[in-house]
Amino acid sequence: MTRGRLVTLREFTPRDVELVASSTPDPFNDFGAVVASRFQAASIGRLVIVRNADGRPIGHVSWHEVNYGPNPESAAWNIGIDLVPEARGQGLGSEAQRLLAQHLFATTAVNRVEASTDVENAAEQGALARAGFTREGVLRGAQFRASRWHDIVVWSVLRGEV
C-alpha cells in the first residue's frame, strides 16, 4: 500500500471489478467496454484508490509498459486513472497519480512515467499538472473512442521530478 494525505493506493482484487465498471460514465474513457478482458490481463498493473477520510474505494489507477526503442532500458510506464463521479474535483486524482508515479519509480528502474488524456479533458490535464507532470504535446487521432478518433495530450514526469 502507498499512503498519501488524501488517498491510499491498495492492491486490486477481483471484487473491485464492479467498482471499475461503476466509475465509467465518463466521456473521456472507455474502461467499461474493456473491463472484463483488459483488467484480467497480467500486462496491466492496477491499484485501487481508497479515500482516507472514510476508507471508501473511489476509483483505480492503472499502468502498462510503453517502449521507445529496442533497448529494454528505454521502457516507460503509461498510467491511467478513473474515479467515481462524486470523488472528482477534490484533489484526490492528483494525489493518486503522484503517488502512483512515486511508487513506480521506487519499485522499477524506469526513468519516465507518462499519461495521456483527451485534448478536451481540462480536468485531467489540471490534475496531471498538479501532480507534477509536464505537458509534452498532442498526438493527433491517436485514440479511438465513441466511434471516432480523438486527439490526446501526453504528459510525463521523470525520475527525480516527483
Name every feature range the model reports, one short phrase each.
Residues 1-28, 46-162:
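Acyl-donor (CoA/ACP) binding surface of acyl/acetyltransferases
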Residues 38-43, 133:
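Short loop/turn motifs at secondary-structure junctions and domain boundaries
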